[in-house]
Amino acid sequence: MAISFLCVFLITFVSLIFFAKKIKRSKWNLPPSPPKFPVIGNLHQIGELPHRSLQHLAERYGPVMLLHFGFVPITVVSSREAAEEVLRTHDLDCCSRPKLVGTRLLSRDFKDIGFTPYGNEWKARRKFALRELFCLKKVQSFRHIREEECNFLVKQLSESAVDRSPVDLSKSLFWLTASILFRVALGQNFHESDFIDKEKIEELVFEAETALASFTCSDFFPVAGLGWLVDWFSGQHKRLNDVFYKLDALFQHVIDDHLNPGRSKEHEDIIDSMLDVIHKQGEDSSLELTIDHIKGFLANIFLAGIDTGAITMIWAVTELVKNPKLIKKVQGDIREQLGSNKERITEEDIEKVPYLKMVIKETFRLHPAAPLILPRETMAHIKVQGYDIPPKRRILVNVSAIGRDPKLWTNPKEFDPERFMDSFVDYRGQHYELLPFGSGRRICPGMPMGIAAVELGLLNLLYFFDWKLPDGMTHKDIDTEEAGTLTIVKKVPLKLVPVRVQ
């Protein structure tokens, strides 16, 4: 009798909780949502280019909408006003990260900055990174590396210009940014290292981004064992683990090299700075770092830092070459400001060419390398544009859609750098119509390092060379078709003929 009474009581109690939650949710003003299928939710509405699919859905259902990816509800934000509420007004309440299978693995169980959920450990790591790794003084200390690598690229392109052979700029600029980053972060020089192979690094970046972007069933169907089983059969587990072991081998090699007492070094790189903290941890316990933390940091740099700068430069050159009058104007302004007899470009020259800075802003607007800010997760109940967003809800900000919003930009699909003339709009996270690096507590800490490489790289390309199309091509043949998921590249590699300007 007592057991029967207890069972009835428990069933009644659980039912009351369930209905109380249902009544509470019914009072919420949830964002509009497209019709969904059972189980899969709205997954069938997401195509090969997720940012474009989400943009088209937002045009129909509004700038704040609720989607369901499997069993997981996701709020998608596609307007400046809504982005400002998420990234500034409610920044503290929604600056955590969801714990995803791929990010957990590659960050070594969240021992990084980019993927780690919000908390005291994350705050200590980010503070260290901003103070020791990405501060202005540190960025400037790597200036000679950026200038040397750009000069090396100019020499390579000049050799190709002799016989007027087409150059795959997509590869050349990837190797430029990779060379800079490997010297800055890992102390490894592509031109001298026997261990680092450029082609293999490019393949590994592609593999890592593809594995992270591939559908991981466990992230959207968190049913005990079911998602894991599907991922095992689909090969997603193997893809992620293959990337993990390749990255681990690379990082372990360079860390071992740094621990070698006889190692000669040209400068103190990021690994040196982190190893120094590990050696001094007995004196200062405010930050705890291990070798796994170094590898987690390096994974962030590897995934976010290598190809994004190259992608930005490729899109900028693509848009300029498509418009002969525009590239002539940009190059004319650069050469007039710098003179015609420079043998080498330095970073001091960048401040003399404001038109180039407008070109970069316009590239960020029309072609952000990462069109969707890494997903945030709410830690409290918030309201965005009057809609309720409960705790533990993932939020995606579609910066690509905001950059093409006709309410914000005149002729948004046109590449027009002069729209930024006499404009205060900047890309450093304070203007929510232009967010290539995000904003708030989760803004990309490597932004100054990335911007420095993009500005100097583009300045060298546009000062020293005119750019011609391969035989048989016209400007109308240059397409801007996109490819990718985490980062968006030009689908057809950009091949041009460099003509050295004397």
Curated annotation (Swiss-Prot):
Residues reported in the UniProt entry to bind heme: C444
The enzyme's E.C. designation: 1.14.-.-
Membrane topology annotation: Single-pass membrane protein
GO cellular component terms listed in the entry, alphabetical order: membrane
Cofactor(s) for this UniProt protein: heme
Localization: Membrane
PANTHER family from the UniProt entry: CYTOCHROME P450 71A9-LIKE ISOFORM X1, CYTOCHROME P450 FAMILY 71 PROTEIN
Family: Belongs to the cytochrome P450 family.
UniProt name for this protein: Cytochrome P450 71B19
Native species: Arabidopsis thaliana (Mouse-ear cress)
